[in-house]
């Protein structure tokens, strides 16, 4: 597990491209038959991924957590962005197709991942945050289980930002201690997300971009509103966004992204909007 320290806005505005990428960008999230785990000291979120191909994978706590098992003091949300597969939680198997999700509450001891077909392996992306209480484990099929009020059609064709935001893990849909996750999908011809942009001092966020053709890129915007920076990203990469940073993107092709948040306020609308004229 890689551990990354927090970052403050005064320092970050002096970072060069390499430093920005080293501190905030997460690549190679789906190693074959292994895990990629990044522990960010920003709100103690863990960003991870795995791709079981020839064997079943078991998630271990490792020395970094100083815990008997991974979810001893944590909760997590898992999404599948590959072929069909399964997650087994303390002996209960949850079968995933593409874009299915799962919330696992604190205290679950054994978490295993496997693919249905090794030639089309599942790709499991997940976020994990500290927890103080056990909530029920919940499987989420986006076509069947997400309530209408948690499916938001946003943007417009004229604004090149028409998109559907599905809130998978959020109070009222799935109860958690602090973790919130969902998927936003841009329609063909739309390339902007979250513009006008915002920050939220009470939460940090991680974006995971996917469904981007190999020859295309996403330009992720970050930094304070008056000190913006960018990171060039490609499909199946994630980026850490501190609470003081904007988090927005444009791209050379439509795309989707999984958003995950950690912090003290689960009110999704608790955002500090930034007027376009104030951006620099």
Curated annotation (Swiss-Prot):
Q: Name one GO biological process term.
A: D-glucuronate catabolic process
Q: Which InterPro entries match?
A: KduI (IPR007045), KduI/IolB_isomerase (IPR021120), KduI_N (IPR027449), RmlC-like_jellyroll (IPR014710), RmlC_Cupin_sf (IPR011051)
Keywords from UniProt, A to Z, are: Isomerase, Metal-binding, Zinc
| Domain of life assignment | Bacteria
Signal peptide annotation:
none
Q: Which cofactor does it need?
A: Zn(2+)
Record carries keyword Cell cycle = no
Catalytic activity annotation: 5-dehydro-4-deoxy-D-glucuronate = 3-deoxy-D-glycero-2,5-hexodiulosonate
Q: Please verify whether the record's keywords include Zinc.
A: yes
Molecular function GO terms recorded: 4-deoxy-L-threo-5-hexosulose-uronate ketol-isomerase activity; zinc ion binding
Its annotated pathway reads: Glycan metabolism; pectin degradation; 2-dehydro-3-deoxy-D-gluconate from pectin: step 4/5
The EC number of this protein is 5.3.1.17
Family stated for the protein in its record = Belongs to the KduI family.
Record NCBIfam families: PRK00924.1
Name-wise, this protein is 4-deoxy-L-threo-5-hexosulose-uronate ketol-isomerase
Species = Lachnospira eligens (strain ATCC 27750 / DSM 3376 / VPI C15-48 / C15-B4)
Q: Gene encoding it?
A: kduI
């Amino acid at each position: 597990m890689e551990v990354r320290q927090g970052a403050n806005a005064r320092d970050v505005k002096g970072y060069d491209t390499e430093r920005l990428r080293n501190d905030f960008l997460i690549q190679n999230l789906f190693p074959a038959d292994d895990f990629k785990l990044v522990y960010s000291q920003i709100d103690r979120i863990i960003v991870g991924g795995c791709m079981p191909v020839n064997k079943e994978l078991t998630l271990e706590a490792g020395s970094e957590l100083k815990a008997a098992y991974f979810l001893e003091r944590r909760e997590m949300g898992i999404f599948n962005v590959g072929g069909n597969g399964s997650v087994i939680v303390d002996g209960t198997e949850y079968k995933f197709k593409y874009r299915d999700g799962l919330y696992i509450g604190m205290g679950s001891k054994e978490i295993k991942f496997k693919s249905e077909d090794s030639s089309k392996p599942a790709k499991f992306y997940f976020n994990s945050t500290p927890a103080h209480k056990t909530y029920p484990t919940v499987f989420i099929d986006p076509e069947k289980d997400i309530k209408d009020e948690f499916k938001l059609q946003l943007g417009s064709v004229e604004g090149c930002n028409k998109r559907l935001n599905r809130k998978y893990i959020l109070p009222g849909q799935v109860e958690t201690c602090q973790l919130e996750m969902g998927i936003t999908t841009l329609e063909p011809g739309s390339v902007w997300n979250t513009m006008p942009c915002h920050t939220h001092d009470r939460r940090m966020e991680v974006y995971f971009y996917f469904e981007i053709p190999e020859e295309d890129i996403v330009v992720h915007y970050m930094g304070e509103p008056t000190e913006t920076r960018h990171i060039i990203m490609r499909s199946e990469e994630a980026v850490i966004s501190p609470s003081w940073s904007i988090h927005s993107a444009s791209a050379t092709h439509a795309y989707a992204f999984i958003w995950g948040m950690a912090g003290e306020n689960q009110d999704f609308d608790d955002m500090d909007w930034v007027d376009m004229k104030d951006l620099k």
